[in-house]
């Protein structure tokens, strides 16, 4: 684990030893809003609006680097415990951004994939996710993975339920159980595990995110709140990652 230096002059990372898969816990929207309440003049959840505005610049930087997978913790299973007004605004922003960014995704050959228990999302958002996913399914320059109504524990429970059904139906045997088989039942089936997990906002925890997948992932924590996160902050995280010696527990 590493804390950020918040170096605004972070250089463009070496193209050697780039992480193939970067995951980000985009934390700090509400704290950012509390700091900027007077200048924002919106509701108490408006930090999410400003957080959404960060994403195009980060996507451009990821494309420039040639990273292949970017996974973003967009909405957790626990977030359903927040005030209804905040949840509604988050969903409104999410729907609007999916609609607005579809031309950008197609122009830049970005494939959208959403993970989590999507069945509990509003029907309109489910429909929009399915539409954007279908429209971008053939692209491979970058896979953008949005974790929506996602929780690492919930993902494992859902995976084990599917495994149990397949064992009962004799599609597989309990003797077949292995790490790779379990991985194939997860939402992230077919994806490599994250090489680098970035958390903005300074909190020192993983918040039920990709619990199975981050067993050997490098962690990087920055105090920068998500609406203030820039490509330079991303470069700094990758520069630190490139200085690590990854041993995979060996």
UniProtKB/Swiss-Prot annotation:
One of its GO terms (molecular function) is ditrans,polycis-polyprenyl diphosphate synthase [(2E,6E)-farnesyl diphosphate specific] activity. Mg(2+) binds at residues 27, 218. Substrate binds at residues 28-32, 48, 76-78, 80, 82, 199, 205-207. One of its GO terms (biological process) is polyprenol biosynthetic process. The active site is at residues 27, 79. Its EC number is 2.5.1.-. Its cofactor is Mg(2+). Binds 2 magnesium ions per subunit. Coiled coil: none annotated. Keywords: Magnesium, Metal-binding, Transferase. Homodimer. Belongs to the UPP synthase family. Catalyzes the condensation of isopentenyl diphosphate (IPP) with allylic pyrophosphates generating different type of terpenoids. HAMAP family: ISPT. PANTHER family: DEHYDRODOLICHYL DIPHOSPHATE SYNTHASE 2 (PTHR10291:SF0), DEHYDRODOLICHYL DIPHOSPHATE SYNTHASE FAMILY MEMBER (PTHR10291). This is Isoprenyl transferase. The lineage of its organism: Bacteria, Pseudomonadati, Chlamydiota, Chlamydiia, Chlamydiales.
């Amino acid at each position: 684990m590493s804390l950020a230096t918040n170096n605004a002059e972070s250089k463009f990372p070496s193209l050697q030893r780039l992480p193939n898969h970067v995951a980000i816990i985009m934390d700090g929207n509400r704290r950012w809003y509390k700091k900027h309440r007077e200048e924002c003049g919106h509701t108490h959840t408006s930090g999410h609006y400003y957080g959404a505005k960060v994403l195009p610049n980060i996507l451009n930087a990821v494309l420039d680097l040639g990273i292949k997978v970017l996974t973003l913790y967009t909405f957790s299973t626990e977030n359903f415990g927040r005030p209804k007004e905040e949840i509604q605004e988050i969903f409104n922003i999410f729907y609007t951004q999916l609609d607005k960014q579809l031309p950008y995704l197609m122009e830049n050959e970005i494939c959208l994939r959403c993970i989590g228990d999507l069945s509990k999302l509003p029907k309109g958002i489910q429909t929009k996710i399915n539409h954007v996913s279908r429209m971008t399914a053939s692209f491979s320059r970058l896979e953008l993975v949005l974790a929506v109504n996602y929780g690492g524990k919930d993902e494992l429970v859902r995976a084990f339920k599917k495994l149990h059904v397949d064992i009962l139906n004799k599609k597989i045997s309990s003797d077949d159980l292995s790490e790779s088989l379990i991985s194939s039942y997860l939402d992230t089936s077919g994806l490599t595990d994250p090489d680098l997990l970035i958390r903005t906002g300074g909190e020192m925890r993983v918040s039920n995110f990709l619990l199975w997948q981050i067993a050997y992932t490098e962690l990087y924590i920055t105090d920068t709140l998500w609406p203030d996160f820039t490509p330079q902050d991303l470069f700094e995280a990758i520069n630190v990652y490139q200085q690590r010696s990854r041993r995979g527990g060996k």
